[in-house]
């Protein structure tokens, strides 16, 4: 059996308190001495938080003391915000990494997509658009397309000597002036539509998933972008699997509303009237 006795409190010169308590347990008397220092901590909070703490409680909590009551209040999980000391350095490192990554991406000078300018599938179409926008500007689109590759032996000799050989002049490269290459380009143009008045927020994925999904497999979708800003110019070229599917898409999509704009859909190259 434990019996507690009266306690003694002694104020010390250093500001602490000595609390002496006595306890009798199983016929033995124990003396317990505790030295306590009282520390007053003041917390600075935002004035809006301080004003909310002064709100009067209502309902079942009327006249209740300050603080949450676990019988009527459910507390969420506490989340501690841990700020790093070198957060500024980490932010600069992430910015530098993003810049290096963006500098390494290949960008076409014509349509702004991730491929070389010489391999742009809409080279001839974009040259016509550039000529309409600025008739006095030199067109450099055809400079790579009209050059015929040199002989395989000369390109191999250049490689052996360590000289740079453009891809169009390397062994096995397609001859842009050949009939087969020209026929394949013409077949692509026959099944390619030009979509204008396109919303600037529409990208290739949006067009495939929300606009072109009824027309089966779409080999190529290119949204023309501004070379400086990277924003869409409201123009896109879509190559379909066949000319018949392209004609069906042209009839169904021309004049249709998409993302708050009325689309204008036509052939990328005008068809000859029969």
From Swiss-Prot:
Pfam families: eIF3g, RRM_1. The modification Phosphoserine is found at residue 168. It is found in: Cytoplasm. One of its GO terms (biological process) is translation reinitiation. Keywords: Cytoplasm, Initiation factor, Phosphoprotein, Protein biosynthesis, RNA-binding. It comes from the Eukaryota. Residues 161-187 are annotated as: Disordered. CDD domains: eIF3G, RRM_eIF3G_like. One of its GO terms (molecular function) is translation initiation factor activity. Residues 191-270 form the RRM domain. One of its GO terms (cellular component) is eukaryotic 43S preinitiation complex. Residues 172-187 have a biased composition (Basic and acidic residues). Belongs to the eIF-3 subunit G family. Component of the eukaryotic translation initiation factor 3 (eIF-3) complex. PANTHER family: EUKARYOTIC TRANSLATION INITIATION FACTOR 3 SUBUNIT G. RNA-binding component of the eukaryotic translation initiation factor 3 (eIF-3) complex, which is involved in protein synthesis of a specialized repertoire of mRNAs and, together with other initiation factors, stimulates binding of mRNA and methionyl-tRNAi to the 40S ribosome. The eIF-3 complex specifically targets and initiates translation of a subset of mRNAs involved in cell proliferation. This subunit can bind 18S rRNA. This is Eukaryotic translation initiation factor 3 subunit G. The gene is TIF35.
């Amino acid at each position: 059996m434990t019996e507690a006795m009266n306690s003694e409190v002694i104020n010390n010169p250093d500001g602490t308190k000595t609390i002496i308590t006595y306890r009798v347990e199983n016929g033995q008397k124990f003396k317990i001495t505790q030295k306590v220092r009282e520390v007053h901590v003041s917390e600075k909070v935002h004035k809006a938080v301080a004003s909310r703490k002064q709100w009067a409680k209502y309902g079942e909590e009327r006249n209740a003391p300050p603080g949450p009551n676990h019988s009527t209040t459910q507390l969420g999980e506490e989340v501690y915000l841990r700020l790093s000391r070198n957060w500024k350095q980490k932010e600069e490192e992430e910015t530098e990494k993003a810049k290096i990554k963006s500098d390494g991406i290949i960008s076409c000078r014509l349509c702004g997509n991730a491929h070389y300018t010489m391999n742009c599938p809409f080279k001839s179409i974009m040259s016509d658009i550039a000529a309409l926008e600025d008739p006095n500007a030199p067109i450099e689109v055809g400079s790579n397309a009209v050059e015929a590759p040199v002989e395989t032996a000369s390109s191999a000799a250049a490689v052996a000597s360590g000289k740079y050989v453009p891809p169009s002049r390397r062994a096995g490269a397609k001859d842009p002036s050949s009939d087969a290459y020209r026929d394949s380009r013409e077949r692509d143009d026959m099944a390619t539509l030009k979509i204008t008045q396109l919303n600037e927020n529409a990208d290739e994925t949006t067009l495939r998933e929300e606009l072109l999904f009824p027309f089966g497999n779409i080999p190529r979708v290119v949204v023309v972008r501004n070379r400086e800003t990277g924003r869409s110019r409201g123009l896109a070229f879509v190559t379909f699997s066949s000319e018949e599917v392209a004609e069906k898409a042209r009839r169904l999509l021309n004049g249709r509303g998409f993302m708050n704009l009325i689309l204008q859909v036509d052939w990328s190259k005008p068809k000859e009237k029969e």
